[in-house]
Amino acid sequence: MKIGLLGTKLGMTQIFDDNGSAIPVTILKVGPCYVTNLKSDTKDNYNAIQIGYQQVDAKKLTKPQLGHLQVNNLPPLKHLKEYKVDATHTFTIAQQLDVSIFELGQIVSVSGVSIGKGFAGTVKRHNFTRGPMTHGSKNHREPGSIGQGSTPAKVHKGKKMAGRLGGHQVTTKNLTVVHLDKDNNVLVLKGCVPGKRGNILSIK
């Protein structure tokens, strides 16, 4: 089972392939991450490693968070995440993981929080068709009927209506690694990833 790392979205740009075609790419700052905890099949009923990312000032963490890290002489780390693995004997507490675990041409999945767009109507949120814009119509961007009458006398759960758009945990799959900079821990992926510049992402 492949492990993952945490990273930060730096932004997007484009590169040109051998044929001169422009390829949109996303630049990520990945790691370095520290192994902060190990879960074993015998003790926890599953094998996993917990990694920490982004060193911060100690006063920005709670005492339980600091204690969890200080037990293993680890620096204050803001973000913790667990990844399931087949076996944990190849990892050690306080081991440092960086972008070198990825390979050129590897297919990865990236998870993060999508850009929040606030309260949105049905046209923007669900791609509803607009009503007539002329000839006396007053139904331009209204959602229309949201259900039947006295039977069932309720609006069904999951009905597409206006509401908050974006700001959800999203995973983008099948992204190709097109460049690696191991000296600066920079990963370049073909395509786009969730969130805005500065978002914390999980690359797996």
From Swiss-Prot:
Family statement drawn from the similarity comment of this UniProt entry: Belongs to the universal ribosomal protein uL3 family.
Subcellular location(s) of the protein: Plastid, Chloroplast
Signal peptide: none
General function of this protein: One of the primary rRNA binding proteins, it binds directly near the 3'-end of the 23S rRNA, where it nucleates assembly of the 50S subunit.
Any one GO molecular-function label of the UniProt entry: structural constituent of ribosome
Name recorded for this polypeptide: Large ribosomal subunit protein uL3c
GO CC annotation terms, alphabetical: chloroplast; cytosolic large ribosomal subunit
Stored InterPro entries: Ribosomal_uL3, Ribosomal_uL3_bac/org-type, Transl_B-barrel_sf
Gene name per UniProt: rpl3
GO terms of biological process kind: translation
Protein keywords: Chloroplast, Plastid, Ribonucleoprotein, Ribosomal protein, RNA-binding, rRNA-binding
One Pfam family matching this protein: Ribosomal_L3
The protein's assembly and partners: Part of the 50S ribosomal subunit.
Spans annotated as Disordered: 126-155
